[in-house]
Amino acid sequence: MAPLRLSRANPLAFARWPVTLITAVVYLAFLIPLLIVHHVVPSPPTANPNGLDLTQAWADLQVLTDGFHPYNSRRNDEVHTWLLQRIHEILDAAPPADQYLSVDEEKPKPAVFVFDDTQSNLSFVGNSLSSSNTAVYFEGTNILVYIRGSDDDHENWWEEPNGVPSGKGGVLVNAHYDSVSTGYGATDDGVGVVTCLQLIQYFMTPGHAPRRGLVVLLNNGEEDYLNGARVYGQHPISKFPHTFLNLEGAGAGGRAILFRSSDTEVTRPYMSSKYPFGSVLAADGFATGLIGSQTDYVVFEVDLGLRGLDVAFMEPRARYHTEQDDSRHTSKSSLWHMLSAAVATTEGLVSDKSDQFEGAPTDDAKVASGSGSKAVWFDLFGTTFVLFELHTLFALSVTLLVVAPLALLVTGIALTRADKMYLFRTSAKADESLDSVPLQGLRGFFRFPFLFAIPTAVTVGLAYLVTKVNPLIIHSSEYAVWSMMLSAWTFLAWFVSRMADFARPTALHRIYTLTWMFVLAWVLLVISTVYQNQRGLAGSYSVFFFFSGTFLATWISYLELFSLPRKSEYANQNRPTSRRASSYGGSRLGTASGEDHEEDDHDAEEEEEEQEPTESTSLLGGGQRTTFANYVRVAGDHRDSDTDHHYYPGVYKHEQRWSASLPTWTWTLQFLLMAPLVLIMVGPLALLLTSALHQTGQDGSSSLFIYVAIAALTTFLLTPLLPFIHRHTYHLPVFLLLVFLGTLIYNLVAFPFSPTNRLKLFFIQDIDLSTGSTTASLAGVQPYVHAAASTLPSTANQNITCTEHTTRGTKCAWPGLAPRVVPDTPYSDWLDFTISQQHNTTDDKEGDEDTHHPRKARITLSGRNTRACKLLFDSPISSFAVLGSSTDPRFPTSSPHGTKEIRLWSREWENEWVVDVAWTTSTNDDSEEGDEGEGKLNGKAVCLWSDNNSAGVIPALDEVRQFAPSWVAVSKAADGLVEGWKGFSI
């Protein structure tokens, strides 16, 4: 083959090196900043902003997290006392009233009211619990701080019986100060708590006094089924706020993400955040059940009727609810990120003058906060926040679904009328001739399905392979998985396209590939639009931008065809004059069958005939003047070549001769219309999904989903390369092949855990208080949970029993070391309960066809050194009531499926609960067979111990922490670390 040279290198030409370099640079230019934004948290300012004290906030966090402080611990009471002390210190340090007026005459020093709520309690069952047959009685110890706004009612309306506020609603900011029994609670939710303390200080600073009143809620009991938020609804001040900001944590650092929001209007203040971070896709994850856990947000929005936002830390999940959720493993940068977002959002909400948060409630018992429009929101590189209404996206989607195909159709008609529609045309006839000139306009049309399907199928196959062989490798090596998927997809797409291009070269590869992509994107946008309209899911906004870029790129390809000669003109210029076969333009496999196979080329003498030199003749001889839009190739001397292949000026290798008229720089514009949009919109979603889910396999979630999701996102991210990848050189794809082979081997054989990415196992110890028999257990993923249990000294020469766990995979149990949660007390005295059966006074009517009648009993229960117990029933009870409990129509107290568990929480230690239960039995159960147990109610009385702040109190847990492998972390399996029980039968 004669060497191919460009007379002058065009840096934007549709040739191998420009395409390779430009596409690689663009992808790196966007992916690297996205990774930096995702993993690097902005540093806090060197000087404290007005009204804030970051040094004090960090010191407060260290005090708060110096011990485990679950609701059922003595340390929890100490934290409660310390918080009240800190609040009063902040309020006492507030400047005198005259300083406020000197800054803003309309905003005098606000009045502040601190409520230590030790009165509210509530019984409820069902709707937001993980199981609808679980009931709860809870006594709250919430702390509320109300900073009166300048526009608020100046009367203490909450002191009146059934008092209600007047005027506009206020703003609630919430964080919970309890931790889990196995975690120090630095991010869950210590950062949220110290942020609330800083907000109190900020809005007590002159110049920041609120217009709308601010209620800061530090609730206790979130970790045990959001109890504190529900009990907040029983306090009179809960009638006042209409909007809220919930601060939460599910990791140990990083950026605080906007998880979800109620509507566009309440989200708008978040736009003022200096470092916005998040996507509405996370909200869709909650709405569809993909994210199973919940925060206090659901209570405020669903149960109480407020409108608000949920801001939380989300990674790493391996440290969530473990002893590494401490101040050592978070940072001041993370604290500043949440604090800055909270200040900006809260200031926007309390400064609002409109009535957009007033209106009829969705339920008579809920707050009259009105309603807003569903929102679409996402950040751009952690610096800009994009927010618009969902119906705007819906309208744009519908418009584009109609306009885009019409635009291509009109363009196609115009091309046909101009006689320049080369697509799908195999030949063209010359004027006044029966002979036709081949156009090869169908070549490349069927290429895209293979280019798209083969790499996608292989990556999905890899997802299944890794799930089968080493499903938890993504726990510690998520980027090894991403590298495997990306490299495999890219190499296969390049290989398939190069093989197709070698066999049947065509200048129509780009336009046909874009046309297929347009159709695929159109179908995806139809599906996305349907979900937007029917289910209110906004997370598919990326599909709209993908379709927009694909449409414009496709349209440009169609417009390019106007630069071609008319087909009849081309046929006249290339009318056959001889009958010799040529390999030019044909298939490069087998016999020549291309453009010149059926046409007579110029005679050899005409081809070799030289033009007379002119002023514009190229100095390189036989060439043409270069233009920005076209290639200029200088062919070698074919007479000296060992092959009959020859290239025509402006034609890329063996592609159709008419393609010489196509511009060669427009591919750059097409690529820039697609790739950056996809990377900006889909890249953060891919990182968000990976961070949220790559360590959830340890919790019992399916590992396959995250692998398949990565495979799908890989396809989404790399699809913009398909129209251009056949022009890539071999260097990068071959390198990616090596990357693929290395990461594939690693992902299949590497151990999935490490000391920095530990496997979370869930501990609990059960003790039969009647016999003293105790069993310790770890729940988690096999075979790792058994391997961890086998390393413990107490399991040596012991039988470890492993059974299937309902939610955690496998539970391995062994005779554990005796707990000392109630020292110097016999096991039988750890829990006391009595049962008195209450007979139904209503006489059954003769001839009553109802074969069921209720039975009732009163159970009195108390535990030593605890304030948490529960009642478990083998069969559901129909109703329950706790003596002294409040009820609320917003929180049901019965379930249509009955109740099999009643959880009891008291603010007092060693409290005695009196519980009335009722259940129905068949009249047949009163027969003699009933004496054998058919009519009886069987169950257990259980008390919980969760205080793990002293070594030796729970030796079995201490043993796991000391002797388990370094790649193991311990978390709680239930509300109690130790659960002691006694059986009963009524």
Curated annotation (Swiss-Prot):
<feature type="transmembrane region" description="Helical; Name=3">
    <location>
        <begin position="445"/>
        <end position="465"/>
    </location>
</feature>
<feature type="binding site">
    <location>
        <position position="223"/>
    </location>
    <ligand>
        <name>Zn(2+) 2</name>
    </ligand>
</feature>
<feature type="topological domain" description="Vacuolar">
    <location>
        <begin position="38"/>
        <end position="392"/>
    </location>
</feature>
<feature type="binding site">
    <location>
        <position position="321"/>
    </location>
    <ligand>
        <name>Zn(2+) 2</name>
    </ligand>
</feature>
<feature type="topological domain" description="Cytoplasmic">
    <location>
        <begin position="726"/>
        <end position="732"/>
    </location>
</feature>
<keyword id="KW-0926">Vacuole</keyword>
<keyword id="KW-0862">Zinc</keyword>
<feature type="topological domain" description="Cytoplasmic">
    <location>
        <begin position="414"/>
        <end position="444"/>
    </location>
</feature>
<dbReference type="InterPro" id="IPR045175">
    <property type="entry name" value="M28_fam"/>
</dbReference>
<keyword id="KW-0812">Transmembrane</keyword>
<protein>
    <recommendedName>
        <fullName>Vacuolar membrane protease</fullName>
        <ecNumber>3.4.-.-</ecNumber>
    </recommendedName>
</protein>
<feature type="compositionally biased region" description="Acidic residues">
    <location>
        <begin position="596"/>
        <end position="613"/>
    </location>
</feature>
<feature type="region of interest" description="Disordered">
    <location>
        <begin position="573"/>
        <end position="622"/>
    </location>
</feature>
<feature type="transmembrane region" description="Helical; Name=6">
    <location>
        <begin position="536"/>
        <end position="556"/>
    </location>
</feature>
<feature type="binding site">
    <location>
        <position position="188"/>
    </location>
    <ligand>
        <name>Zn(2+) 1</name>
    </ligand>
</feature>
<feature type="compositionally biased region" description="Polar residues">
    <location>
        <begin position="573"/>
        <end position="585"/>
    </location>
</feature>
<dbReference type="InterPro" id="IPR007484">
    <property type="entry name" value="Peptidase_M28"/>
</dbReference>
<dbReference type="Pfam" id="PF22250">
    <property type="entry name" value="PFF1_C"/>
</dbReference>
<feature type="topological domain" description="Cytoplasmic">
    <location>
        <begin position="1"/>
        <end position="16"/>
    </location>
</feature>
<dbReference type="InterPro" id="IPR053976">
    <property type="entry name" value="PFF1_TM"/>
</dbReference>
<feature type="active site" description="Proton acceptor">
    <location>
        <position position="222"/>
    </location>
</feature>
<feature type="glycosylation site" description="N-linked (GlcNAc...) asparagine">
    <location>
        <position position="799"/>
    </location>
</feature>
<feature type="transmembrane region" description="Helical; Name=5">
    <location>
        <begin position="511"/>
        <end position="531"/>
    </location>
</feature>
<keyword id="KW-0325">Glycoprotein</keyword>
<feature type="topological domain" description="Vacuolar">
    <location>
        <begin position="690"/>
        <end position="704"/>
    </location>
</feature>
<feature type="binding site">
    <location>
        <position position="176"/>
    </location>
    <ligand>
        <name>Zn(2+) 1</name>
    </ligand>
</feature>
<feature type="glycosylation site" description="N-linked (GlcNAc...) asparagine">
    <location>
        <position position="121"/>
    </location>
</feature>
<feature type="transmembrane region" description="Helical; Name=8">
    <location>
        <begin position="705"/>
        <end position="725"/>
    </location>
</feature>
<feature type="transmembrane region" description="Helical; Name=7">
    <location>
        <begin position="669"/>
        <end position="689"/>
    </location>
</feature>
<feature type="topological domain" description="Vacuolar">
    <location>
        <begin position="532"/>
        <end position="535"/>
    </location>
</feature>
<feature type="transmembrane region" description="Helical; Name=2">
    <location>
        <begin position="393"/>
        <end position="413"/>
    </location>
</feature>
<keyword id="KW-0482">Metalloprotease</keyword>
<feature type="topological domain" description="Vacuolar">
    <location>
        <begin position="754"/>
        <end position="986"/>
    </location>
</feature>
<feature type="glycosylation site" description="N-linked (GlcNAc...) asparagine">
    <location>
        <position position="948"/>
    </location>
</feature>
<comment type="function">
    <text>May be involved in vacuolar sorting and osmoregulation.</text>
</comment>
<feature type="topological domain" description="Cytoplasmic">
    <location>
        <begin position="557"/>
        <end position="668"/>
    </location>
</feature>
<dbReference type="GO" id="GO:0005774">
    <property type="term" value="C:vacuolar membrane"/>
</dbReference>
<keyword id="KW-0645">Protease</keyword>
<dbReference type="Pfam" id="PF22251">
    <property type="entry name" value="PFF1_TM"/>
</dbReference>
<feature type="topological domain" description="Cytoplasmic">
    <location>
        <begin position="497"/>
        <end position="510"/>
    </location>
</feature>
<dbReference type="InterPro" id="IPR053975">
    <property type="entry name" value="PFF1_C"/>
</dbReference>
<dbReference type="GO" id="GO:0046872">
    <property type="term" value="F:metal ion binding"/>
</dbReference>
